[in-house]
């Protein structure tokens, strides 16, 4: 038995047909975009359901043939071989349908606020933070996404002490959300004369870009300070108070922004980041309260959790959450093979979700 929710699948097929019918009539521009987007999301599931039902019917015909005592031995052998192949195909389709029916993260389609901070390791940590940012930047380009740097504090020898960027593209959060955590690098610094391997770290935070309707921020909960922007050495770099610091009093979250000469633009950027951080903090609190659910996740999303090691001497990348090692570090750092890690993490997360629903992977 497949244990698929046939009634629910019937409703989805009917809804898909209704959307296709709407496109044949006169549709407003906004509705056209909405309908085509929804169809593109439903198409893989609908195709899998139709294929599954065709295979199910074919298997029924084969069973009838095998139960018929008049079926000759040669025909029976052919039917049994075809049944085995169709059985395997049916199981694949059932798994596809179950995965497609898993509850979606409401934020999966959102843009991303990507924050990378150098951790332990001094200058090497800053250089590694720069490597990570370029890795995500190249990966984003391969996905057809855009990356806009919101704020950056450069390291003394290169890289970044901290960099915040907005990654814009459909499904950005779904792809990048498992990247949050501590990334560790092991390599020989250029300044190391004895050839010793140094270990450094950088912290990555991937936050969904949230809108005002997603987070209720009361004006009375904000403390807003303005000041003159400062350069690397602490000197004031302009005469107007364009820098802004916003403190969310209930949570203690502070965002400082001074990259633009416009106070208005700095304030808007700071509020965007603040909303994402408040939303993320609330999600962290909810996840912590749901200990049973948290165990089924690929990592907890805890910013202090070491999730991945990049070992340059061995040319390997190891993701500790799923014990996956790829000996293609240059391709991962170039953004080209990062998708292999992300896909493996996504699959593991889906397997855990299916197991929680009582389905074997």
From Swiss-Prot:
List of residues that carry N5-methylglutamine: 235
Gene label: prfA
A GO CC annotation given for this chain: cytoplasm
Organism, as annotated: Rhodopseudomonas palustris (strain HaA2)
Protein name from the UniProt record: Peptide chain release factor 1
Cited HAMAP family: Rel_fac_1
Pfam family, one: RF-1
Region feature (Disordered): 286-305
Keywords: Cytoplasm, Methylation, Protein biosynthesis
Modification comment: Methylated by PrmC. Methylation increases the termination efficiency of RF1.
SMART domains linked to this entry: PCRF
């Amino acid at each position: 038995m497949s244990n698929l929710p046939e009634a629910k699948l019937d409703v989805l097929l009917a809804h898909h047909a209704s959307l296709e019918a709407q496109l044949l009539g006169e549709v407003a521009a906004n509705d056209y975009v909405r309908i085509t987007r929804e169809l593109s999301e439903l198409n893989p599931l609908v195709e899998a359901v139709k294929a599954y039902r065709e295979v199910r019917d074919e298997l029924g015909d084969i069973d009838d043939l095998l139960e018929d005592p008049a079926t000759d031995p040669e025909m029976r052998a052919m039917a049994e071989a075809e049944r085995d192949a169709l059985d395997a195909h049916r199981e694949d389709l059932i798994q596809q349908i179950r995965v497609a029916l898993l509850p979606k993260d409401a934020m999966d389609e959102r843009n991303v606020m990507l924050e990378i901070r150098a951790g332990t390791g001094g200058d090497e940590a800053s250089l590694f933070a720069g490597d990570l940012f370029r890795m995500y930047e190249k990966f984003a380009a391969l996905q057809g996404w855009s990356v806009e740097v919101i704020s950056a504090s450069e390291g003394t020898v290169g890289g970044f002490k901290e960099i915040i960027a907005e990654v814009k593209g459909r499904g950005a959060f779904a792809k990048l959300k498992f990247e949050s955590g501590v990334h560790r690098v092991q390599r020989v610094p250029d300044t190391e004369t004895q050839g010793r391997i140094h270990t450094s770290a950088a912290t990555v935070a991937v936050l969904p870009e949230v809108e005002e309707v997603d987070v209720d921020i009361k004006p009375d909960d904000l403390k807003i300070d303005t000041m003159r922007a400062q350069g690397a050495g602490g000197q004031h770099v302009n005469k107007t108070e364009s820098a802004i610091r916003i403190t969310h009093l209930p949570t203690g979250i502070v965002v400082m922004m001074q990259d633009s000469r416009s106070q208005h633009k700095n304030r808007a950027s700071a509020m965007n980041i603040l909303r994402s951080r408040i939303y993320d903090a609330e999600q962290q609190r909810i996840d912590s309260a749901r200990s049973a659910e948290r165990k089924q996740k690929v990592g907890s999303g805890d910013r202090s959790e070491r999730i991945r090691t990049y070992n340059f001497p061995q040319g390997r990348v190891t993701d500790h959450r799923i014990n996956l090692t790829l000996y293609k570090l240059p391709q991962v750092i170039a953004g080209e093979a990062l998708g292999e890690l992300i896909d493996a993490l996504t699959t593991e997360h889906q397997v855990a979700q299916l197991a929680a629903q009582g389905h074997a992977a």
